[in-house]
Amino acid sequence: MLQPKRTKYRKMHKGRNCGLSWNANVVSFGQYGLRATAHGQLTARQIEAARRSISRYVKRGGKLLIRVFPDKPITKKPIEVRMGSGKGNVEYWVAQIQPGRMIYEIEGVSEDVAREAFRLAASKLSVTTAFVVRTVR
């Protein structure tokens, strides 16, 4: 699964996920893309599950590009532990998603294959998405 090899700090503030995506919001590398239309977080497991479903559907055709990376650690305290005594341990990693962010891109397949592959992948993700086609080459 995806996670950073090394980080400067182990834990991170919660922060706020607001605004629109100003980078990675157009299809840059492939012909078709899956764009987020809502705010949310994608865990490394969700990104991997969606990648597998796309790969299974397109089989050996096409090239898939993942445009998001889970670089934010989410911590959690163990069950039945009292409040206080510091922040919990890192449980999993997430990528913060804003509306307009391109999540996946694919090339080398027909539009209906790409559309169906992204439909299968979208059911694995926790944000609403839209299928987009590259306009300018």
Swiss-Prot record:
Signal peptide: none annotated. SUPFAM superfamilies: Ribosomal protein L16p/L10e. PROSITE patterns: RIBOSOMAL_L16_2. Keywords: Ribonucleoprotein, Ribosomal protein, RNA-binding, rRNA-binding, tRNA-binding. InterPro entries: Ribosomal_uL16, Ribosomal_uL16_bact-type, Ribosomal_uL16_CS, Ribosomal_uL16_dom, Ribosomal_uL16_sf. Disulfide bonds: none annotated. Belongs to the universal ribosomal protein uL16 family. Binds 23S rRNA and is also seen to make contacts with the A and possibly P site tRNAs. NCBIfam families: rplP_bact. This is Large ribosomal subunit protein uL16. It comes from Xylella fastidiosa (strain Temecula1 / ATCC 700964).
